Every structure is written in structure tokens, then in C-alpha cells.
């Protein structure tokens, strides 16, 4: 463990010049600056423990134990410098038990939630959590943090957090720490975060004693001195001191920049030398000098009587009789000798083969094997020294880069006999596993693939998608045409083949499903005779089914041709199991094989008929499955029966504590991936694969999918098993509306709950809801009492958008949408009135509606009834009922038969709300950042009050817990106003 003190010397060199000689004035300045403080009274010198030792050192955590358990220790500092990828999470450092992995002390960054968490062991053996909110620590930038812990040995301690030299948070009255630290030095283990690509941990130090000013200076931070000094000096001295400190800070910054540059240059040179092919030893052999063919020794004297007929010569050698006997010719090719005796020549000694290729000597001749892998050329075979010298084997390097060895659009480096694949070429992104595709970026105009009329969106893992802007429609944001009614279909056909390139069959009426019953090219939404039977829709008893005779046996409002119960009056046409037979005449409404009269859940399939509480209502549809409530009363419409509804909700997320899977953590969605009864928001291992989500030995690279081996072939920090589908719901992340929630994949309001907000009296009728386009469009046809159509899906953070259109000219009342719905007394509503009007029933109070858009928080003590009805109508606050959070200052009402697009952002964890309205492509209303925490999440839906023929088209929702950037700006402005 390295001990560092502020008095340690530092000498740098630049070229042949000592940096200390050129910058000696800086140390003189430091000496002059510190003199007044030394005169004012010496402070204890800080002890600094470097927790990032070099690889040659081995950290001994036991050395920290006497420091942390020192009863005289009043202050403790932890300083760190690091960089984390955007939205990532990591445990920066921590002390753990090496025997059972329990925590003693730990600091974790949760980038997705913009939080940091400090955990430490209390006296009672439990872990205490200190949460720092709204911190931008995981954004791909280098950050410096300083933790100041005071009086943690005594109790009633405090923690201060400094980020990049600025105090951002403090927490007081903390319980005692470190007293429970084990006395066995071998049982303590120090861990730092596991590095990912593009992450680094540059500095991690523990500092004891010393002042905050002294410790901050270790990070080149010069904070205002908090301790009173014995001799502070005059105001002129303070100004002079601050000026000197500023100069010193700049000087130290130059030193650090110089060091970083030198390190980069050294690393570059080292890597260049290591990879240089020409710098290593050559791999070929020098040719052997030519050798002379030995001269055959003189033939021995021939016996006078020996002739060629005795075959005295070597086989194949020509023999000639002479006067003195015989004469042999030269040895055959591949041999050497005197003609009588011939020996095989080893041609391989003359290196006829390509270097590295095996040469085989034959009798006679030689043979070269095939060229090595990565080379091409002929196999050489021949006889004789001359042939071996003049017919050398030639092997030519194969250029694999021309043969597609690497993926398209990547760098390919051809080497002698081989090749090497590099990264993608400039302008492309990817790797050798996934391929290299054209680099697309929303931040660089040259790499932005989107239409000029489209919005560019950067998705998970850097993917880019395009979405046509408001008032435009087309193919995935690449080709966009004008869209007057904002239903995602262009007014005129576009030059592309996608479905959304076709011409809108109702140009001025939004119909995102493009329904056309008679296939005449005119959509049902704007066709006066939608079924083409010659009878106008207003008189037709089957609007979408051709029936000239208009026969109607049961005399309800639906003709026999389209009536799902021809002999039974059923104006609601409800068909629970979708079998074409209406519930009114279907003896098995839910299609589970059990007749209605015997079925304990007639409208919910449940073959097992389980009924734990024995109240005659099956568990599948029982609002209190463990408490008998045969009447199923649910006054507040929260899907929890009155008999078991406690209305005790500690975290305010809409789920009472007795059923909440995270009672003290906001999680309205109640997502529990591993079904262990603990919600993901408070579960350390969401997928139960043994790899913790965040803490060591994690983080889990597939948090929602079991993968204990953590395979990650491209080292991008995301496991192979969840690379393109993070929640493994069979819908790829690019089109998944909730990529981290397998229970939500697409926008769908086909299943909804109707809530009547004025159930008493007969002033008006209840709303009539019609759902189209597979749950992405809702129509309300009646002039009705206030009412809601609420989806069953609950959300934490959410983005909700849709097109709003009043398709009539005969009324002027309220229409809008809701979010954060928890029960019929608790929800947010955005509502729009066309004209000013006093409600016609003055009981219980006179209610006046003003024109314009209003954002209201409903928290009614009475619930549905005349009080809530008049409070919703009235523009303004009403006691114990409704609060007006924002109103459009233009006081402009909606226009008849005009389409508007709304965008809502709700982040219940911080209370962030913002809603915007567009008319065509023009922004006409913006609430700005509005903060309210009345409802901490909930369900979505639509709202109407005394207004008929409302269309909510092209509805879209998306899970989103990311805090928008303007929230930080809003906080800064708010703090500035408070300071002033």
C-alpha cells in the first residue's frame, strides 16, 4: 500500500529540459500561497492510502482495519476519478467479507437512474443506505468525486458528496459505522469495479485526518476553507489568495495535460514497435554458394579383354568399345560419377524449393511439396543439379483481402502468408462478428440517415432510428410526406413499398388502422356509406356489413347481418371469448369449457376453478382472493376489492403495501422477472442466475435473462444471449416499446377498464368506447357524463403520445387523456375545452370551464360523484378534489375536425411531467417542466366529458425511466431563484 503526503516531490522532464526548472515559479507561488495558512495554525497532515496499487504490489486490506476502527477518527475521505459508459452501472469500490461476501462499505453508481448509493455496516449488523439522487456520473465523461464522512464512529454522523469540485449533496444524522468490522485481518477483502470497454478507474484513495481543503487539493480542487483560521487576513489578502490559487490551479492543469500527452505518445510508440512486421528477424535462409560438380576420378586400367558386351557401365550409360577396351559415357541426370559407378545427387542441397517447403530427394531427382497456406504456386519436381538451380519453386503470397477474408467495409491488412482483420473503415460501425454497416449518428449531419422531415433517435447500444416528424409520415423516417391528420399515413403515395408509404384513405380524419369495409378506397372513418350497401351510415343498422334489407329480429340497434346475438337484445355486442357469439347468448362466455351457470369466473378463463377464500368467486377474477367478498365491491375502481383494500401505500406507486412486491421502492409496473416475489426494482439479482445485477462479482451483462457464464463474444458489455432482445420477449429491442420488460411489447388498449366519474343521476349517459387498429385507436361516440377508458398496464416512467381529433361541429366540451391512474380518485388528467361555459348543474358548487388545455392532479376525498364531476369541469383548484398544475396561457380551444398530436413525459421517481401539443408540425402548447409527486406512477387511458365523436388515433406508449436533460436545467434555475 502506497502512502502519499501532500509534501511529496514531483519532477517532470520535457525533452532535455527539466520541467521543474521551467516551472519553478509555480512551486514558489504554492509556497507563498500556503504561508498564511501555516502562520494561521498548522493542521494535521492527511494520511493518504492509495487503493489502486501497481501490479507488482499486492494490497493488504488488513492495513485499513486499524484506521477505520480508530475511535479518535472523526473524519474520513474517499476520493476517486473515473469514467463510465453512458447509462451503465458499477460498484466503484467496496470492503467485503472474504468468507461470506457480506458488505462492510460500498459505493455504487447507478447510471440508468442517475443515482449513487453508499452502503455501510451499522452497529446492529444491518446495512445502511445513503442515496444520492440526480447525479450525472455515467455519461462517458471523466468525473472526480470526494466523499467526506464525519463522526461515523460516534453516531449522528454526516456524509458530504463533492462532484467535480462542487458539493452536490449532504446527508446528516447517520448511524454509527465500522464498529462491526471484523477483527480478523484475513477476512477483509477490497474490490474495485470490473472494467468494461471505454471505462476506466484512474484514481482511488482513502484519506484520514486533515481538512477538507487539504484533501480537495489532492484532486486539484480548491474549495472555500470551511474551518475558521486564526489569522484570516484582510479582504485584499483573500482576493489575492483566490487569484493565486486560480493561477496555481491552471498551472497544475497544464502539468496533468503534459503528462497525459507524454503517456499517449509513449504508448503509441510502444504499440507501433510491437506491431511492426519489418522490425523482427528475417525468416528466410541465405542460399548456399554454388558447388562444383566433382570430377570423376580416372578410370582404372581396363583389362584388354573386357568389352561392352559385359555391361561394365552404370545402367543407362552409353558404352563404346575402343582399341584398348571400352569407354563409358557420362552418368544420367541426377547422378554423379565416372560412368561405371554413379551416385545419386541430392538436389535438395541446392534449395530448389520455396523457403519453408519440404524438399524430398528421389533417386533420381527431387520433389517440392505444395506451397504453404497463404501462398499459391506449382509443385516442382525434376532431376539434376542444373534443373534444381534453374527451376526454383516460386510461391506467391495470396492476398486474402481481395478474396473477402474480412467482413465487408472493414480494414483488412494483408501479411506475408496470412492476413489480419482490423476495425470497420471510417464511416462504418460494427465488428468482425456483427459486420460493418454504414455509421449512422444523430449528432453528425453527414452520418444522419434520416429525412429532413424526420427526427433522429439514438437507441440502446448506439443504434439509430428515424421517425417522421409530427405532421409527416412515411417509411421509417427515411422517406416522409405530408400527413395532415397525423395518423401516420401520408396525404399522397410515396416512392417506397412500406405500408406507411400508401396514400391515406381518409386524408382529413385520423384512422391509423386504415379500415375500409367495402374496399372502395375510402376509409370507414370518412365514408358516408362504409359498407357500400346504398344506405348511409346514420340510417344503417349494420354500418360495416352490407345489408340492404336491414332485417333486425331482436329490435336492438344492430341488424341481423352484424348482430352477434340475433335473437337477444344486446346493444353492447360484448363478446368476451371472441368466438362471434355475444355474451348475452353465449352459455360459455369465456370459452373455458365450463358453462356460465357453473363457472365461478364466467368472463375469465379458469379451468381449475380455484377459489381459495371459498366465496364462490374464482381466484382468477376475485378482487380479494384471500378474503371472502362474494359481491366483489370495488368502490374506488383500483381492481382491489373493498374487503381487502387498505389504501396504505408507503411509496405512493398505486399498490398497497400488503400486495406491493417492493413496498418501499417506487415500482408501479411491479415487474418481477424471476417470479420470486421480489420486484426487480428492489431485487439484487433480477433473473436469479447467481450473478448480481450491479454488485461484485457483477454487474450482470444480461440482467433479465439467466446467463451465469456471462458470454460476451464482442466484449460490448451486453451478453450474447440478450444482445438484440434484452428482455427475451421475442420482440427485438428496436421495435419493443419496453425493451427491459418482457410483459409489455406493443401498444394495446384492446383490454381496458371503464370508469364512470358521475355514476349517480341521469343528466347524461355513460361513454361508449370503440377500440380499433389492434388497440392503437379509440373512438368515443356519445355526448356523455365524465368517464375514463383505462388500460390495465401500469408504468413507472413512461412516454405517451397520440393524435387527438374531434370529428364533429356540434359540441364544445372536454376531451383529453390520463396518466398515473391508481384509482378513480387518484390520477393525472390533461383536458382541453373548446369554449368558456358554466356547468348546468350548480350543485354542489358553481363550476366554470375556461377554454384551453389544462393539466390537473386529481386526488379526490369523495371519489366519483357530483363533487368530482364539478371539480373536473371547473378551471382551477378545488379543495380536497383537484389541483390545477398548469394551464395553456393562450386560452385557445380546440378546433372542429382538426388533428392535434400530444407528447407526454412522466418520470414519477422525481415527479417530472411535461406535455406538448402540435397542430400539424407546429408546436402550439408546452407545459414546460412541471414537478408533482402526487401519483408515483400508474396506468394510462383517455378522458371525455360531455363531448361526442372524439378520436384518439395512432396511440403509442414507451417505458422510459431516463431523466430528461431539461430536468437538470430546471433544478439549477430553481436553486438560483431560491438563492436570490
Swiss-Prot record:
Job of this protein: Adhesive glycoprotein that mediates cell-to-cell and cell-to-matrix interactions and is involved in various processes including cellular proliferation, migration, adhesion and attachment, inflammatory response to CNS injury, regulation of vascular inflammation and adaptive responses of the heart to pressure overload and in myocardial function and remodeling. Binds to structural extracellular matrix (ECM) proteins and modulates the ECM in response to tissue damage, contributing to cardioprotective and adaptive ECM remodeling.
Tissue distribution: Mainly expressed in astrocytes, and in ressponse to peripheral nerve injury, significantly up-regulated in the dorsal spinal cord (at protein level).
Compositional bias (Acidic residues): 679-690
Glycosylation sites: 631, 960
Record's protein name: Thrombospondin-4
Pfam families, sorted: COMP, EGF, TSP_3, TSP_C
Localization terms from the record: Endoplasmic reticulum; Sarcoplasmic reticulum; Secreted; Secreted, Extracellular space
BP GO annotations: behavioral response to pain; endothelial cell-cell adhesion; myoblast migration; negative regulation of angiogenesis; nervous system development; neuron projection morphogenesis; positive regulation of cell division; positive regulation of endothelial cell proliferation
Keyword terms of this UniProt record: Calcium, Cell adhesion, Disulfide bond, EGF-like domain, Endoplasmic reticulum, Extracellular matrix, Glycoprotein, Growth factor, Mitogen, Repeat, Sarcoplasmic reticulum, Secreted, Signal, Tissue remodeling, Unfolded protein response
Gene Ontology molecular function terms on file: calcium ion binding; collagen binding; fibronectin binding; growth factor activity; heparin binding; identical protein binding; integrin binding; laminin-1 binding
Region described as Disordered: 596-691
UniProt family annotation: Belongs to the thrombospondin family.
SMART domains to which the protein is assigned, alphabetical: EGF, EGF_CA, TSPN
Domain called EGF-like: residue spans: 304-343, 344-381, 397-434, 438-481
Polar residues bias locations: 659-671
Extent of the TSP type-3 repeats: 482-514, 515-550, 551-573, 574-609, 610-632, 633-670, 671-710, 711-746
Annotated signal peptide: 1-42
Organism of origin: Rattus norvegicus
Positions of the Laminin G-like domain: 43-210
Subunit architecture: Homopentamer; disulfide-linked. Interacts with PTBP3. Interacts (via EGF-like 3; calcium-binding domain) with ATF6 and facilitates its processing, activation and nuclear translocation. Interacts with NOTCH1.
The TSP C-terminal domain, residue ranges: 750-964
A GO cellular-component term linked to this record: neuromuscular junction
Cystine pairs: 308-319, 313-328, 331-342, 348-359, 353-368, 371-395, 401-412, 406-421, 424-436, 442-456, 450-466, 468-480, 496-501, 506-526, 542-562, 565-585, 601-621, 624-644, 662-682, 702-722, 738-959
